């Protein structure tokens, strides 16, 4: 009898051990992390928050815009980080240690300084830097002097009634996309 009890206990232990080993582990939460980036031959890096920005103007009064008003200016900062301007200026050629920005995007017909919006609201976006309207036709703006470390290129953006012939401000959502390119000198 004792031998059969011991044999039964050993058999149960073997079966239990085998079952526990075969049971899959169920995660108690999981996710995925994807890492991306681009290495560029430039004296500065563009901060992540500057490389892909979104500006929300909120709700704007139709009658205010129609009467020639403009929205509250919103900051549009382009942060350049980890700049090594000393080495850049000391490289081949006579380099000044400056950067020029060129903006592109759909423009209001005849008004390269107005970014046309989608949505049929009769609105446009105007971006200013150093007191001047930027153009969205790919032309480079004024040179910005850079220093080692971090540099912030400050712009502001406003919404206004489009200068297109016959434009009228209408209700609805609008959006616009502008791209920028940097040229170091």
UniProtKB/Swiss-Prot annotation:
Its main location: secreted. One of its GO terms (biological process) is cell adhesion involved in single-species biofilm formation. Keywords: Disulfide bond, Fimbrium, Secreted, Signal. Disulfide bonds join 44-83. It is found in: Secreted; Fimbrium. GO terms for cellular component: extracellular region; pilus. Residues 1-22 form the signal peptide. InterPro entries: Adhesion_dom_fimbrial, Adhesion_dom_fimbrial_sf, Adhesion_dom_sf, Bact_Fimbrial_Adh_Pro. It holds the Pfam family Fimbrial. Transmembrane segments: none annotated. It comes from the Bacteria. Strains of E.coli that cause infection of the human urinary tract produce pap-pili which are hair-like appendages consisting of about 1000 helically arranged subunits of the protein PapA. These pili mediate binding to digalactoside-containing glycolipids present on the epithelial cells which line the urinary tract. Belongs to the fimbrial protein family. Polymerizes to form the thick (6.8 nm in diameter) rod of the pilus (also called fimbria). The rod is a right-handed helical cylinder with 3.28 PapA subunits per turn. Pili are polar filaments radiating from the surface of the bacterium to a length of 0.5-1.5 micrometers and numbering 100-300 per cell, and enable bacteria to colonize the epithelium of specific host organs. PANTHER family: FIMBRIAL SUBUNIT ELFA (PTHR33420:SF3), FIMBRIAL SUBUNIT ELFA-RELATED (PTHR33420). This is Pap fimbrial major pilin protein.
